[in-house]
Amino acid sequence: MRVGERAVNRVSGMRRNSPRGSVTLADVAALAGVSTSTASLAYRSTGSITPATRARILRAAAELGYAGPDPMARSLKSGRSGIVGVVVAGSIRRAFQNPVALATMAGLSEALDELDVGQLLLPGRREPHAGAAPLLEGMPVDAVVFLTRGEEVDALLPGLRARRIPIVGVEGPHGDGVAVVDIDDARGMGELARHVRGLGHRRVGVLMRTTRIEEDGPPGPVVPVGQGLEEIVNRTIRERLRAARSVFPDAVRVEAGGRDLEAGEAAAGVLLDLPSPPTAILAQNDMLAASALQAAAARGIRVPEDLTVTGFDGADLPWLGRRLTTVEQPLHDRGVHAGRMVGELLAGRTAASVVLPVRLRTGETAAAPA
């Protein structure tokens, strides 16, 4: 009997004697005429193995119907799953509709690709949809990146720390053991507000991001811009409001009832329908600014001739049809920084938090009041 025939017969015997007749990596190695450790190298992206040997091992695997090493067994052996959890604001569906989230995830993916790890997107919302909490509790992730912040995120941190899972936050959450990629919200909004004041505006309304856990609801009431400021948990919202108040202490604000354009338009409408409407609206992000433009157009209000509208983020909004006056933050780069922080933490090193710069971008939506 030839050597190849003996190998095939030996493998057939292994298949009959193994549980449920399953094929193992040792079976593949025997058929390919290599050691089990050499056969395992064919399924890794790194390792010293010649192309010819890899091809022979994969041919043997195909002949035996072997799909590859059990990822759970590999995870148990290495202590790594090769998965990084990424928690987004609200639902995953809405994250894919958000240009800020998309640009950040693109940068994050670019950096994580270099680490040869996969990503698991998790929703940050709470009831009636449970969100990330029950998923993360038993999920074998190597690290978690938060693209959101708030009470629901803070509640997850103790469990992750107890499991010694590295945590990275983009604009939060802030706390012990969290590496944060931040931007200078206060400086950016302050510079933007001073620009608007320099144009001559004094009657100003602030269109505020929602602080609600639930997805949808009516706009909030018109209140002074600084009312209840310290009670706002979201640091980004709070810092941008504080900066606007420092320049326009008499400004008013309205909170959007949700994250979509319709919710922002409804909130902007509340400001525009006031007996003495503002001559300028400072929106806390570019999507809210787009909503304000829609609300103005629906009322025949010209921008910037009759109304100044500004945003924050510098998001890619080609469908807007005009260049928005806004504050640009490095959306792609903050994702890259977050991914590199993950790499540092997985390597057992310390990842220092960073504050990235922002800049004022003048566009076509701001002018002196009529």
Residue ranges and their predicted role:
Residues 64, 139, 199-201, 271-277:
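Glycine-rich phosphate-binding loop signature in dinucleotide/nucleotide-binding domains
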Residues 1-80, 370:
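N-terminal helix-turn-helix DNA-binding module of bacterial transcription factors
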Residues 1-23, 83-86, 91-198, 370:
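Alpha-helical recognition/docking segments in bacterial nutrient-uptake
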Residues 90-103, 122-129, 150, 181-191, ...:
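Hinge/beta->alpha junction and helix N-cap segments in small-molecule ligand-binding domains
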